[in-house]
UniProtKB/Swiss-Prot annotation:
This is Protein argonaute 1. Keywords: Cytoplasm, RNA-binding, RNA-mediated gene silencing. The keyword RNA-binding applies. It comes from Leishmania braziliensis. Residues 18-33 have a biased composition (Basic and acidic residues). GO terms for molecular function: RNA binding. PROSITE patterns: PAZ. Disruption phenotype: RNAi-mediated knockdown reduces RNAi activity. Levels of mobile elements TATE, SLACS, TAS-like and repeat element CIR74 siRNAs are reduced. Belongs to the argonaute family. Its main location: cytoplasm. The gene is AGO1. SMART domains: PAZ (SM00949), Piwi (SM00950).
Amino acid sequence: MLALNAGSQYPGRGRGRGRGDGGNRVHKHDGINRYHGGFRGGRGGGGGGFRDGDMRECRERESWAVSAAQANARTLARVPVPVETNCFPIDLSEGRFHNYIVSFEFLENATDMAGDMWKISLQNELLRTIRKNRTAEKRTRTSAEVEDLCVCTGQAILAPAKLSVEDGFSIECTRKEKVSRNNTEERHYRVRIRYDGEVSLKLPEHAQWVNKIIAFGLADTYSEHIGSDYVDMKSTVERGGDLVTMDAISLNALRIVKQSGSTTAMMDVLQLDVSTKASTKTKCSDEMRRLRQQNPQGFRRAVNEALVGISVTTVFGEPTFLKVKAIDFNILASSPTMFKTNPEETFVEYFKRKYDAIIDPTLPMLYCIFADRTKMSRRMPYPADSLLLNKLNEAQLSKLPILCSIYPNERMKRIKAALERVLASPLMITVLQQYGVRIQPQFVKVSGRVLPAPTIYVPSGPNMFNRINTAEYTGQAGFALGLKDLQHPSQPCEFKTLLMDEYFMHGNITHWLQKYNVALPSPRKTSFDSAAQRITEGPGTFAMVKLRTKEAGAYNNFKERFARSSIVSQMAVVDLTRNVPQMITQQVAAKIGQLCFVADVDEAGKSFACRPLLIVGAVVGTAMNTMLEKYKSINVRLYTITFVAFLANGKSWKPYCMHHQVKGEEHVLYEDSDAASSHMSSTTLTVRRQNANEVLNNRFPDFLKEVTAHFKLNGKGSKGTMVLYRGAMTDAEVGFTANMDLVMEQVLPNWDTATVVVHPRSHFRMAWDPTTVFPHETASAYAGLSNVPRGFSTTDCRIILADSDPYTPVDSFYLSAANCTLGHAANTYYLVQKRAASISLMDLQKLTYNMCYMYPNKPDALPLPLPIKCAYEYARKYGSLKSVKELPTRMRPTMHYL
């Protein structure tokens, strides 16, 4: 737990700032800028931000590397390409700890509280008692006393040496919990310790313990643990416009497999990444005043909807991340603190005396806990003037690409500097020595190959295609110019009605629909005044609407209304100038199943040639939605399970899709005093009713049967190939893929199948020095590390999961599919859980890479292949459409989500 300032009731704060919790700006879709999730600063690092000259130099280095790779494509395809990674060797040969099992006996008023933090708090009290019984020395921050270096996990205590305590030693602990303003209950527990022997550290079995041990040593460098990141709150830098940034790192101990030709070797490594967190200097009090001025009558509800559940940062004393759990409108800053030392002193007087701060006495108190889940804390009252919002507004979000982007050359420098700083800290030195862990500060290098860029085919008439050599297109526009002669072959029109508002009718769209031979009927002019108006048309209708605002709410309302009527729609807010009409028309064609550019499946290799190929993408998306009732506001986490399928035969690609919504956790943000029993609004957690990954597995057989019936693939003599791409944002999701191949074998018994887990957010980083392949470029002004070439793939650094047999052959690869000149490219990890002997790993890599060029909204290579990119886009878009819990049947053979 973060120590309190002497004489202070609050975690302290200096001049630090908070962690960004706004939204990530994502790509435009249908002309809408949409935001989701919390900002992680994932591309940033080490202080963030660039001077103009630095950024220009980095961009020029990346552009030069792209040009060098293009000019020497044949050479790159023939030779191994060495790259540096953000992994460092870790030696656990002497690593060990003494394991102590801790049990908890519930005494008077005791309850089993949520999480493990209360257990960790009791374990720390037990250790303090053991230390006190053994020595009278006062604990120091870098003390080498064994009790001071123990790692508490909730279930056990990891000690670097044996504790001076007998088996069965126990203490009775008391915890006070405030159940109301004037009522506190004492809860009594008995904590007992039992020795379970010495354990030698091994990866991957003890990865979580190794990570906890190393994290313990970060307390004097990156002390704040938020999610998977460790933040240095003292690294705060003001960036102007009420923005601040700070440094953060993430680390993970892994066992990997390195391959060199036919030989393989296992290696233990520490994976370390850097990032920059962004936050704001806006106080909670400023937001409260704005909301009160905006709507005095609805002030309480608006404040709860805006602030309850968000992360904030303390203004005074030591910088600390907190989470707002409740707002009490009956307790103002002018109320007495009820602190033991001076219970009649008001919060206004306390902060004036302690920090010489001016506090607004009219605003309600916010009750907060530590945002760091590794710290045990009870709710503490904070005046709104003492807390900073971590949520960024739209103007601040627009600055993040400059503040938080970091390029490979700079990233690798900062990673090395961060590791050197951590290893030099007195606490980390002591921790590593005591537990027998050694970390070597040399980057692990791997080798890979560059896959050839695919040929893309553009329809130009009946059974006619224009060829595009994608290797020739490396600019931001991709191969868009290659679509100028696009003309789809004639096909039956599945849509009976095309509705256009006046904007589209006069925007030259009809001309391009005819020129591209898009299978839609002649348009009918319609006025769409609002999403609430009655729409008489139903299935078999396509609607095109110009939105008046960029607000996501208007977009969602129209999408929801159309989807309930089985209407596929296209919306835009941009002006129909320059090449915008062509781009919109190409997207419309793709939505109804006429892809404007495709790869030839036969060219991916003989594993997929001359037979039907069924490709399925399956993911779980998540979104927070606020549900407004008459007397209540509830935050609901919705999980959207999406399935996207394509039947490919040569150059023919036919789509199909489906989704299901699963309701997750609910948090009550506001409840009217007439309906609620308390004046304190707070979050209430309901038990998650279903695990979304389990629902995906349960729904997968029905979807696969539906797809095979739609494409008529389930005949007795039916043979072909199926590849399942299962998206996984975390390692925990990987396990849910284990039995999906059995479903594929049951539904398509005569088909060859492969199952691939796609991990798009691994912290695995790669950086390439072009001079290692092109020595003649050594004298270049742009020499240094850059992004790996587009198409770079490596089977090195396969991660061994804790529950897997390291000696069982498993295929996997990293693939960097897209050029990146605006930061550090993501390296998607592909774990091949199962594949038929007839499907070669090389062909599977080619197929995956070729599909990275096929996303209809972007005629260029993207980091993710078509099925996974579509599935995530589908989940992101429909996660906000609460009433469309399942897609109507008539919309399923489309790509409506584009």
